[in-house]
Amino acid sequence: MKTYSFSGLNSFYTCPYAYYLHYIEKREEIDNAFNLYGSFVHEILEKYFKGELELFELADYYEEHFDEKVPLDFPPNAFVDLGQTYYDNGLAYLESFEGLDGYEVLGVELEFTIPIFDGYALHGFIDLLLKDPRGDIVIMDHKSKKKFTSKEEKEKYARQLFLYALYVHEHYGRWPKRIVFNTFRSQKYVKIQFTEEALQEALNWAKETIEAIESTTEWNACPSEFFCDHICGYRESCERKRGSDN
């Protein structure tokens, strides 16, 4: 059975050539400050929900380990110091975070692989699987993104968690009540009710994306200045960076 991840499927639309380098050539990538920052806050929340850190320890752990965990510079910005802004946002969140009283933790960084179509499976990690005080199941995803810029953008991000609901149904025999984005830099929870219609849309998208990937013979680059210069894992080695075919 061939296995895909949501991030892999999504990356095909960001840049097919980067997808090719990562998933087909399996070329080694370099990291970026945004990824390292997000992973670090994920790590802290994982430690808290697994009982490895107490609430009062979170901010101190963040301050003590930030430079070690996020050694790369953030991109330059004409209006703000992104590195300082991200640091301050993360610290403010962890200093004010009060936990999730009344919620039962069902899983933390829960890894799974489930079949989605004939011959295909989805591999993923659920950041936090919860049971709320009413007994309903909630899928929570921690996001360093401060906010969604549009309804369409929010729906695109939500596809991932709707697909992850397949694991919940397989494991618990029922669908989650809602999916939640913990946009921790803004200290807000973005809640979306689960519907089978939204799940079907996500499945259709996944199927169409897999079909597009498997029928692709020309792995074209989709160069953009910010992505190519600061985000792409192949920004120092790509032969087609920002449209250059040399």
Annotate each predicted stretch with a short phrase.
Residues 1-246:
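RecB-family 4Fe-4S metal-dependent nuclease core
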